Amino acid sequence: MALTQERKNELIAEFKTHETDTGSPEVQVAILTEQINTLNDHLRTHKKDHHSRRGLLKMVGQRRNLLTYLRNKDVTRYRNLVDKLGLRR
């Protein structure tokens, strides 16, 4: 259920804005999206896992805040990220 280090490194390499980038909003949103998708699949089979559902809602809220920050700061980066991840916005 947790994101492996290899997959996290792949996401960082794909969405980084410069060579040593690990904490830009793009990277954080990409990692959160991957975790949200994994947790969503888990909750489809385990419908009564309310602890994980609460964690999912917290992650979705955190991603929403990061996307709002990015949209206010730089609209083109925001649009590129949403298109690349296939998010509804």
Curated annotation (Swiss-Prot):
What is the superkingdom listed in this entry's lineage?
A: Bacteria
GO biological process, any: translation
Q: Which UniProt keywords apply?
A: Ribonucleoprotein, Ribosomal protein, RNA-binding, rRNA-binding
Question: What molecular function terms (GO) are annotated for this protein?
Answer: rRNA binding; structural constituent of ribosome
Q: Which Cys-Cys disulphide bridges does the record give? A: none
Kindly state one GO CC term assigned in the UniProt record: cytosolic small ribosomal subunit
One Pfam match: Ribosomal_S15
Q: Which Gene3D superfamilies match?
A: 6.10.250.3130, S15/NS1, RNA-binding (1.10.287.10)
Q: How does it assemble?
A: Part of the 30S ribosomal subunit. Forms a bridge to the 50S subunit in the 70S ribosome, contacting the 23S rRNA.
Function, in words: One of the primary rRNA binding proteins, it binds directly to 16S rRNA where it helps nucleate assembly of the platform of the 30S subunit by binding and bridging several RNA helices of the 16S rRNA.
**Family the UniProt entry places it in:** Belongs to the universal ribosomal protein uS15 family.
* UniProt name for this protein: Small ribosomal subunit protein uS15
- The protein's gene is named rpsO
